[in-house]
């Protein structure tokens, strides 16, 4: 089906902190409501041989336990939270992508990202057979699709990004 929808991609840079924000605005230009089943704030495309993703998971009394894993070629890794407003306890919507090797404190190329959203989210990392990494982040509306009324506007939460060629300590 075809819907009268306009999607705007917004990017804002903050030179003083070397960060970027990216988000999307969805405009329903029709008269009827539509359901949004997924709404990504941002997507990235990278190319190198190996990718490692660091995430921060946990539970009460053991929050923000750091774990790092390689995204194998042809595979996808997803960080998902469907706990609503308990997201901060179960896992952070933040990540580190390390290129060509595990993340190091003071060397190596890394991208840090955090979705500025306290509710359900989905962050995914797909390593293609051709050595591209496609990554995206956004709120997860799968448990309850968002109804965007006719003439309505929906703004996704921003994904905050920064990059360093000198390890995660500099980023």
Language-model features: where?
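Acidic/glycine-rich phosphate/pyrophosphate-binding loops and surrounding catalytic core
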Residues: 113, 117, 161-171
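Generic detection of long, well-ordered alpha-helical segments
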Residues: 14-17, 33, 150, 165-169
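Polysaccharide-binding surfaces and accessory modules of carbohydrate-active proteins
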Residues: 1-126, 132, 142-144
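Short beta-strand and strand-turn-strand segments in soluble, beta-rich domains
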Residues: 135-139
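Short helix/loop capping segments that flank catalytic or ligand/cofactor-binding pockets
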Residues: 34-35, 123, 156-157, 164-165
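Short Pro-Gly-centered flexible turn/kink motifs
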Residues: 146-164
């Amino acid at each position: 089906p075809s819907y009268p929808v306009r999607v705007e991609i917004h990017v804002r840079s903050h030179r003083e902190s070397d960060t970027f924000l990216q988000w999307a605005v969805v405009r329903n230009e029709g008269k009827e409501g539509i359901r949004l089943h997924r709404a990504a704030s941002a997507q990235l495309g990278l190319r190198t041989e190996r990718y490692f993703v660091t995430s921060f998971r946990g539970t009460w009394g053991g929050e923000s336990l750091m774990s790092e894993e390689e995204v194998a070629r042809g595979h996808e890794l997803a960080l998902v939270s469907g706990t609503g407003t308990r997201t901060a306890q179960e896992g952070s919507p933040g990540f580190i992508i390390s290129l060509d090797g595990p993340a190091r404190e003071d060397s190596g190329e890394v991208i840090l990202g955090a979705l500025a959203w306290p509710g359900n989210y989905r962050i995914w990392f797909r390593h293609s057979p051709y050595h591209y990494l496609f990554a995206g982040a956004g709120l997860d509306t799968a448990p309850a699709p968002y109804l965007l009324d006719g003439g309505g506007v929906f703004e996704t939460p921003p994904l905050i990004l920064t990059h360093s060629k000198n390890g995660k300590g500099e980023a």
